[in-house]
């Protein structure tokens, strides 16, 4: 196997001369420092090369060494310092965080470290150039790894147009210097890892699924008729084995025979529930598809969603609302405990619900629906042109701007609708509060760049569907009354009864929340519930695919 040192001039050597004496008998610290300084000063700004590769922290790294007066950070004149071993150890284990050790020069660092250890064993001192190479790579490894831990390997806003991330920032150069001074390299990097229990649970799931992948392969359930309770088939024996491997069926309940009994039905329901399927207990086409998804795909899903955790703020808030688009679900969380759940309807694939965080500050009871221009011209105008009575039946008004932020109501009978088009529509449409209003009786506002909010709906039947991507981007919620009661908690004027009365009154009212509540619109295709159940969902917007491609193309430069 070819050694990774590549003639020991692995970092920056091809662009800079060697200082006389650096490889000879002189090993004073000032020789190594002078060599380090010359390399950094002669390197192109923001383009420090290492065997043809750009050092990822090339914007931060020179400033770090300048502050130190170019003193080496990771070695003495004889050998690597203890903090170097601590960093190498951390990098060796960083795959537990779904990060890649080789991204942080692990192979080169281990080789250079071993070369210095060999030199010490021979009572020799390592060449200054080797020490400088090692030092630069170590510093780059810390800065890059730290950056990936706190804000992810890629920037989601460069992958998705509809993803706004409040990613964390740290002055990693200063963080590194403090860690070196305190001799706490490993502890410092661990302190940067997300502390949310959901991240920790998903990280444990990654370890569990990697162990499963190293064990007995998941058997494939062949295509065939629907398997259901009281039936017999050879495939049922295979089904039992498959469900035992993922813990959906306990080993003690596995009779090993071909009968679809009560215990197997419950195991199938459990499997279906944690994969977002209707838990009917029968193994049809969709359940077979989920059962036959390779474990490598599931591991990749977990890794992608750990990356998404790193895009979130450090604190989600002691009270916050989580909407998982891929799960069509909403959770209210207090002190890391889920206290309220409900189904939601999200945007269609071509009108996707965006991902972002905001602060809910008020609710609007009996809201008007100000129809977005795109919906008015693309969807409603053709209906109006076919039936001029459509607006009256739908309780809609036609408005026209008259300047100074004022509008006037226009008689729809005075408008020549057939002359209008998507490019020629000088009106606005507004639907009155009432049973036909798609916003229902209440909406929950957290101002944002996307104009997205949570709201009641007049189409209650959609919550009976398993997949619920039907909206234009806003989020319809299953339990608006319970949710309103929660967010207005603390205001004695807004009891459940008073909220119901206000909704029934048909009068539009804006009510400020007693205190703002964080709202996080997320997209998770893999997560772990509080009870330890590993959940997977279909990638309804193909965002897993986009993220996989971005990670393959390159990682974020700090």
Regions found by a protein language model. Name each.
Residues 8-17:
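Bacterial N-terminal signal peptides
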Residues 6, 19-22:
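Intrinsically disordered, low-complexity segments enriched in proline/serine/threonine
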């Amino acid at each position: 196997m070819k050694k990774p040192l590549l003639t020991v001039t692995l970092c920056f050597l091809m662009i800079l001369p060697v200082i006389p004496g650096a490889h000879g008998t002189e090993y004073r610290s000032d020789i190594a420092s002078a060599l380090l300084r010359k390399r950094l000063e002669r390197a192109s700004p923001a383009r420090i090369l290492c065997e043809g590769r750009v050092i990822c922290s090339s914007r931060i790294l020179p400033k770090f060494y300048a502050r130190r007066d170019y003193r080496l950070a990771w070695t003495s004149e004889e050998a690597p310092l203890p903090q170097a071993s601590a960093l190498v150890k951390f990098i060796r284990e960083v795959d537990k965080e779904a990060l890649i050790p080789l991204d942080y020069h692990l192979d080169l660092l281990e080789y250079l470290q071993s070369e210095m250890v060999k030199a010490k064993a021979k009572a020799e001192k390592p060449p200054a150039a080797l020490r400088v190479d090692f030092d630069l790579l170590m510093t780059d490894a810390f800065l890059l790894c730290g950056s990936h831990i706190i804000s992810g390997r890629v920037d989601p806003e460069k992958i998705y147009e509809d993803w706004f991330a409040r990613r964390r920032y740290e002055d990693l150069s200063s963080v590194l210097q403090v860690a070196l001074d305190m001799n706490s390299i490993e502890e410092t990097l661990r302190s940067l890892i997300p502390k949310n229990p959901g991240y920790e649970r998903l990280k444990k799931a990654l370890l569990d699924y990697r162990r499963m992948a190293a064990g007995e392969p998941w058997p494939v359930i062949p295509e065939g008729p629907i398997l259901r309770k009281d039936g017999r088939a050879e495939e049922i024996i295979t089904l039992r084995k498959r469900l035992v491997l993922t813990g959906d069926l306990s080993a003690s309940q596995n009779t090993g025979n071909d009968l679809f009994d009560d215990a197997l039905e419950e195991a199938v329901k459990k499997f279906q529930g944690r994969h977002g399927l209707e838990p009917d207990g029968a193994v049809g086409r969709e359940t077979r598809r989920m059962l036959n998804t390779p474990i490598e795909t599931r591991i990749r899903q977990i890794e992608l969603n750990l990356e998404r955790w790193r895009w979130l703020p450090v604190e989600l808030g002691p009270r916050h609302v989580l909407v998982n688009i891929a799960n069509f679900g909403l959770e209210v969380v207090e002190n890391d405990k889920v206290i309220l759940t409900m189904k939601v309807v999200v945007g269609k694939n071509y009108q996707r619900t965006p991902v972002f965080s905001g602060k809910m500050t008020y609710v609007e009871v009996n809201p008007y629906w100000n129809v977005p221009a795109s919906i008015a011209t693309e969807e409603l105008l053709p209906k109006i042109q076919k039936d001029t009575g459509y607006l009256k039946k739908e309780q809609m008004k036609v408005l026209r701007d008259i300047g100074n932020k004022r509008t006037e109501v226009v008689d729809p009978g005075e408008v020549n609708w057939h002359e209008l088009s998507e490019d020629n529509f000088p009106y606005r449409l507004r639907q009155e509060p009432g049973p036909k209003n798609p916003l229902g009786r209440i909406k929950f506002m957290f101002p944002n760049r996307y104009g997205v909010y949570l709201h009641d709906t007049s189409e209650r039947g959609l919550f009976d569907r398993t997949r619920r991507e039907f909206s234009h981007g806003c989020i319809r919620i299953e339990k608006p009354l319970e949710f309103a009661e929660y967010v207005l908690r603390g205001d004695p004027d807004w009891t459940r009864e008073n909220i119901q009365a206000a909704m029934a009154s048909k009068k539009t009212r804006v009510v400020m929340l007693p205190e703002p509540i964080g709202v996080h619109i997320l997209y998770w295709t893999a997560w772990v519930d509080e009870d330890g159940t590993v959940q997977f969902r279909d990638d309804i917007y193909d965002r897993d695919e986009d993220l996989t491609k971005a990670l393959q193309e390159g990682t974020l430069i700090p």
